[in-house]
């Protein structure tokens, strides 16, 4: 019996180690006062955004953190902790959780986060949630880069367009 428990714990540590190894960002939450249906709703919203969510056993989470480059996050594992993490969009865990908390008046509390190999405060998580997604930022950059090119094309086409208008007017004048 003890051996089965040890094997299950090792599997849990290995899975969490893998999750921490690929996570670019994470948000830690205190889930006290959250019922199962609300927790399921949170997981669904996070999954739709490509974000993983795990309820953690603190001792196993500390062991998993020791197995990765993120051993400095062990301080976040106190009390009932769940972790939302993403390997793709750095902003997604913070944005989805903060939107959910503000829209549902949930008892879920953000206790901190992890970004760029350091722990961040609740205030920094809130600021991170306000940032636009990666796709929006890329489109803004591309629009900014495209704007001068479009202007240049309009300027270069201006004389040709003007010549075409003058020629069209001359043709009408000769016909009529």
Curated annotation (Swiss-Prot):
A biological process term (GO) from this entry: translation
Keyword Cell inner membrane: no
Gene Ontology CC terms: large ribosomal subunit
Ribonucleoprotein listed as a keyword: yes
Keywords: Ribonucleoprotein, Ribosomal protein, RNA-binding, rRNA-binding
Cited Gene3D superfamilies: 3.30.70.1730, 6.10.250.290
A molecular-function term among this protein's GO annotations: structural constituent of ribosome
Entries under CDD domains matching the protein: Ribosomal_L10 (cd05797)
Entry-linked HAMAP family: Ribosomal_uL10
Assembly and oligomerization: Part of the ribosomal stalk of the 50S ribosomal subunit. The N-terminus interacts with L11 and the large rRNA to form the base of the stalk. The C-terminus forms an elongated spine to which L12 dimers bind in a sequential fashion forming a multimeric L10(L12)X complex.
Stated family: Belongs to the universal ribosomal protein uL10 family.
PANTHER family with a match to the protein in the record: 39S RIBOSOMAL PROTEIN L10, MITOCHONDRIAL
Biological role: Forms part of the ribosomal stalk, playing a central role in the interaction of the ribosome with GTP-bound translation factors.
Classification via NCBIfam families: PRK00099.1-1
Protein name listed in UniProt: Large ribosomal subunit protein uL10
